[in-house]
Amino acid sequence: AAHREERYAALAIIRSKPSVSHAGRMESLALYEHFLRTGQWWDLVDETSHAVGLVVREHPAAAARMRAWATDPDMWVRRSAIICQLQHKDRTDPGLLSDVIEANQEDSEFFIRKAIGWALRDYARTDGDWVRAFVQAHPGLSPLSRREALKRL
């Protein structure tokens, strides 16, 4: 897709009809990664990350790919690895969440720091004690990440 609108249309189909669009298949990660690397803006990356999350939730093997993405030179790929488990609630893999955040906790980029806080705040709705302990154990988290993580606790 050459235009943002086409990508948004594709992502809308993926989200509305995941079983028909094969959204949660491991093979779909290649398309999502292409969107991340070529979309290069937060709104498209965040929407794509929800689709990535479908794969992560259905295929435990995708966690290894997210750990690799967490250290990728491309900031948007790293952001996706951090936020791909949003809204997974009790199906969130805290080990994966911890690993992708730890790989990025000292990054000074706003979009990474915000993603860390967002991912932690979202998981706090499910396991606030885990998030409090994580934030306390990671003094290297930026003030923005800490504030966002603890906002509703």
What are these regions (language model features)?
Residues 1-153:
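Alpha-helical scaffold domains
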